[in-house]
Amino acid sequence: MNTPLKPKHGQKTNRKPKANKPVVKKQQTKQPPTHKVQGEEVAAVKSGLHPRNRHRGQYDFPALIKVVPELQSHVMKNPKGQWTINFADPISVKLLNKALLVLHYGVTYWDIPEGFLCPPIPGRADYIHRVADLLLKGNPQLNHSQVRALDIGVGANCIYPIVGVTEYGWSWVGSDVDPVSIQQASLIVQSNSKLQGHIECRLQKNSQHIFNGIIGANERYTVTTCNPPFHASLADAQQGTQRKLTNLQANQRKKGRLATPTLSHSRLNFGGQKAELWCPGGEAAFIGKMAVESQQFAQQVLWFSTLISKGDNVRGMKKQLEKLGAQSIHVIEMAQGQKISRFIAWSFQNAEQRKLWWQAKC
């Protein structure tokens, strides 16, 4: 065996010196996973709140209280000395949402009837910003005033159109099967000069339809959005509400805060009406029906999209869209704190057809 020669004093050696600190290797950023749809690679993106999201960081409670003074009596300090609210209290959540809309989006009137869905605005805004990125990727010189969007299930809160109009100047149609939701959403639009002329609310008269009965024969939409019903039955929805409330109360007790609201008092922030929360077959059935109907409007809509709450439903939805002939599918994940959500977007038009769409200035 050859014995390695010891280097002479001052002579360089290739042997690595021992060190107390570990050697840190430069890590390359991993590329997001992709899948191919008829020749196109599609990325699944995961990140935190969008850079353009106005709700990054802590809530500015002094500013929020200034625009909605009623919020002040609902604000408290957590054990860390940070201002917050009791998110198990429906009135607190509603007032926070109202203040966020007034402060950040210039809304002068916003309200929802008792028992209707009061969605977390930061996550809803993230969906719109990432949809905007999808459109900008296909057309970097996008004129946002040319974008026409359709929100399926606009709800009484009208959140997606509000964000889309105030942030980007898009025009919207919001549909819903519930007459009260349409009435309230219309009142919000009529009561805000910023929204007037930019949002139209339409009643879906057939609860078995999604796009049929809403998209007119000569209408074209740049994109559709949707927050689909998650549960398969009223019982499932009630159990889900109770589970969320229990988890939140346990978390608050752990942080030294009292959490007393019961299920009957939590309908506003965790609840919602039938069409908002459940439908036969749950989320999988709803988005499956949406996929099938979307094929009928393949040439009238550039991009379809919907949130998917249950990660297990993504794979089935992608397979169904591929069978239906979708040319491009994007699965975009979003992170709000510890919560991961995602939406899926698809188009039946290939890259060249999408380019021609923009050239036609829809």
From Swiss-Prot:
It is found in: Cytoplasm. Belongs to the methyltransferase superfamily. METTL16/RlmF family. The lineage of its organism: Bacteria, Pseudomonadati, Pseudomonadota, Gammaproteobacteria, Vibrionales. One of its GO terms (cellular component) is cytoplasm. Disulfide bonds: none annotated. Its EC number is 2.1.1.181. It is an enzyme of class 2 (transferase). Residues 1-28 have a biased composition (Basic residues). It holds the Pfam family Methyltransf_10. InterPro entries: METTL16/RlmF, rRNA_lsu_MeTfrase_F, SAM-dependent_MTases_sf. Specifically methylates the adenine in position 1618 of 23S rRNA. This is Ribosomal RNA large subunit methyltransferase F. The keyword Transferase applies. Keywords: Cytoplasm, Methyltransferase, rRNA processing, S-adenosyl-L-methionine, Transferase. It catalyses: adenosine(1618) in 23S rRNA + S-adenosyl-L-methionine = N(6)-methyladenosine(1618) in 23S rRNA + S-adenosyl-L-homocysteine + H(+).
